[in-house]
């Protein structure tokens, strides 16, 4: 950046500050080594959405996606870390240059380091930018489910039923109580004269959150709409032309699943288990082993990993 650039002064002060911190930390490291102390650093899998990295090299990231985690006993709706996910195809095309430079810089200060969420090098839980809850995510990369897998098991693939929020009068009452009529009149419309559908301004959790923040809906309506939006069985894989899908995590607890007939439940259960616990292992191994060995060779540090 040239000194004549409009942002030069604002950026240069950070260069100066970081360089001084670099010198101070190196001095501390040198002293620690004379005392026989080994230093261990820490590097998280993700970077802040508004970081210098995403500003300088946005092509290395999926800025329209968010990293997070699926539901567990501590977070029933999953986690949304709001960090962009990596565009590994672009990163790999540069021989992992950005990641190698990160490790090499860390080696100026540390003898060993921990990769926080090392599983992210194999796969990441990815949530579309327009959604808020981790439950709206899926594993990326992953081998999806195909329409043929449902049909070969005797289930006719009903796109509307399986991929759109399942909404009934009973569900509206459970979610909204006395505000159910208001939701029915303001947030929904009838498709084909019988199926409730969300109006366009209520299709995403992020849009609903904005309406709540603007004081246009109550907190109960916000959370109820979040639950309606997530009451689906499948997420369509982008650009798959309606042929590939990710199963919604924890679908068996949903009213949309409970409304299936028994043969449909069996097939959805089988395919969900197949997707989450069987078909990905070899694929994820190959995904991780394309990245980690190359990155390990970038420095002499001892690498530790945590899930």
Where does each model-flagged region fall?
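Catalytic cores of glycan-processing enzymes that make or break glycosidic bonds
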Residues: 1-307
């Amino acid at each position: 950046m040239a000194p004549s650039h409009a942002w030069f002064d604002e950026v240069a002060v950070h260069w100066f500050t970081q360089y001084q911190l670099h010198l101070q930390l190196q001095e501390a490291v040198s002293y620690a080594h004379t005392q026989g102390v080994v230093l261990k650093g820490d590097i998280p899998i993700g970077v802040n959405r508004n970081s210098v990295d995403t500003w300088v090299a946005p092509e290395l990231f999926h800025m329209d996606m968010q990293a997070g985690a699926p539901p567990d006993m501590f977070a029933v709706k999953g986690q949304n870390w709001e960090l962009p996910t990596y565009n590994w195809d672009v990163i790999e095309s540069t021989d992992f240059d950005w990641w190698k430079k990160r490790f090499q810089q860390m080696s100026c200060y540390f003898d060993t380091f921990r990769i926080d969420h090392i599983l992210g090098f194999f796969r990441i839980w990815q949530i579309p930018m327009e959604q808020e809850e981790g439950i709206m995510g899926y594993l990326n990369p992953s081998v999806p489910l195909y329409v043929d897998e449902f049909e070969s098991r005797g289930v006719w693939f009903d796109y509307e039923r399986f991929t759109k929020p399942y909404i009934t009068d009973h569900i509206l009452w459970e979610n909204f109580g006395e505000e159910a009529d208001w939701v029915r009149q303001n947030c929904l419309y009838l498709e084909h004269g019988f199926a409730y559908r969300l109006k366009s301004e209520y299709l995403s959790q992020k849009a609903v959150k904005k309406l709540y923040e603007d004081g246009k809906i109550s907190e109960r309506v916000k959370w109820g709409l979040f639950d309606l939006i997530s009451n689906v069985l499948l997420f369509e894989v982008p650009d798959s032309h309606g042929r590939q899908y990710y199963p919604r995590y924890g679908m068996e607890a949903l009213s949309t699943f409970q409304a299936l007939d028994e043969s449909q439940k069996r097939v959805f259960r089988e395919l969900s288990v197949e997707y989450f616990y069987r078909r990905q292992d070899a694929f994820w191994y190959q995904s991780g082993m394309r990245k980690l060995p190359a990155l390990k060779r970038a420095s002499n540090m001892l690498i530790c990993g945590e899930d």
